């Protein structure tokens, strides 16, 4: 699985989505936030050490 970082425009919250590809990650992000914006892909270490919520 890959880790994708997003930011929600409405709340300003940054969060991670664990998914197979960016399309799946967007679907998951939209399930939890109204207006998510993709930032970048991070590796396993960055995801674990970021302290961000992961969906």
Residue ranges with predicted function:
Residues 31-55:
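Short, mixed-charge low-complexity intrinsically disordered segments
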Residues 1-13:
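Short aromatic-glycine-(Arg/Gly/Cys) micro-motifs in beta-strand/loop hairpins
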């Amino acid at each position: 699985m890959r880790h994708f970082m997003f930011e929600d425009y409405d709340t300003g919250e940054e969060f991670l989505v664990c998914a197979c590809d960016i399309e799946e990650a967007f679907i998951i992000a939209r399930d939890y936030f109204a207006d998510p914006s993709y930032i970048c892909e991070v590796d396993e270490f960055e995801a674990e050490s970021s302290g961000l919520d992961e969906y």
